[in-house]
């Protein structure tokens, strides 16, 4: 598909949109900077005055490091405030209110629907299928729903939150082929580091209607830094960058993130991912033996979705043990479920101990 075709999916009124040109976007040179109305002095809380100036909108060093990490070109990557900002930019950039639909696969991460509703974009739901192999996406049904609704965006969460299932790469490619020139397929790989399924990023060379979301919040343990990446066609990235707020990446967060992508830090992250995967298998095997546990779904993420005979009792037993998990009971089709993040071995033992004591006391 030609580069122009993905841009045909962008809102007509935004294709020539220039956005806001901040003081940091100009390529001027000097040693006295008086162009952004910043303070000439640092704050007492900032002894080296490193935060008195506005940050680079897309820090070059961090952008290059993220591109290397994910295997794309820097111009194909946009840094944002977590994946949430990227989701919002995609919906606002592609969807005309009351016309262009967004396809989601509940139960799934709620921000896709939130952003669609804020844009007043029609929301099309294609529920996950609850089968013997877990809750999984019905990709042919998703594609058909997108075609029927003339959707502009299709969100595929892989691994899915909270279901834990991943979509095979061949099925993602089939969706991209079927929706070429019709919709952008957004693959949310927030939990990709924990998965056996390869990243969809490699498909970008053949399909410019692909967008991939990645984050440093999960495997890289930088949730508070809010460093998310949108990886997509370079022309689409340039357009969405013009739609983005002027200074999305605070300097302290960018510095920390770049340090986290050094070789020694990445080696630590990989060791922890390996440990989490091992603990995920151990906790899964142990939970299925606990009385009152109805089902433990297989997971490609750093969490397990668990159904209980009495989810309220399980939730309260964990709280009494000082363990806070995600209550899923208000989510349609998950009225008996809790989502449990994989913690340290000791933390996972506390989960098991609390649930086992609950059953012994029953």
Swiss-Prot record:
Q: What's its catalytic activity?
A: L-histidinol phosphate + 2-oxoglutarate = 3-(imidazol-4-yl)-2-oxopropyl phosphate + L-glutamate
Under InterPro entries, the record lists: Aminotransferase_I/II_large, HisP_aminotrans, PyrdxlP-dep_Trfase, PyrdxlP-dep_Trfase_major, PyrdxlP-dep_Trfase_small
Q: Name one GO molecular function term.
A: pyridoxal phosphate binding
Key words of the record: Amino-acid biosynthesis, Aminotransferase, Histidine biosynthesis, Pyridoxal phosphate, Transferase
- Transmembrane region positions? none
Q: Which coenzyme or cofactor does it need?
A: pyridoxal 5'-phosphate
PTM annotation (N6-(pyridoxal phosphate)lysine): residues? 218
The answer on whether this UniProt entry bears the keyword Transferase reads: yes
BP terms from Gene Ontology: L-histidine biosynthetic process
Q: What is its EC number?
A: 2.6.1.9
Superkingdom of origin organism: Bacteria
Answer whether the UniProt record assigns the keyword tRNA processing to this protein.
no
Known pathway: Amino-acid biosynthesis; L-histidine biosynthesis; L-histidine from 5-phospho-alpha-D-ribose 1-diphosphate: step 7/9
What family name appears in the similarity comment? Belongs to the class-II pyridoxal-phosphate-dependent aminotransferase family. Histidinol-phosphate aminotransferase subfamily.
Q: What does the subunit comment say?
A: Homodimer.
Q: What is this protein called?
A: Histidinol-phosphate aminotransferase
Q: Which organism is it from?
A: Xanthomonas campestris pv. campestris (strain 8004)
The opening ranks of the lineage are: Bacteria, Pseudomonadati, Pseudomonadota, Gammaproteobacteria, Lysobacterales
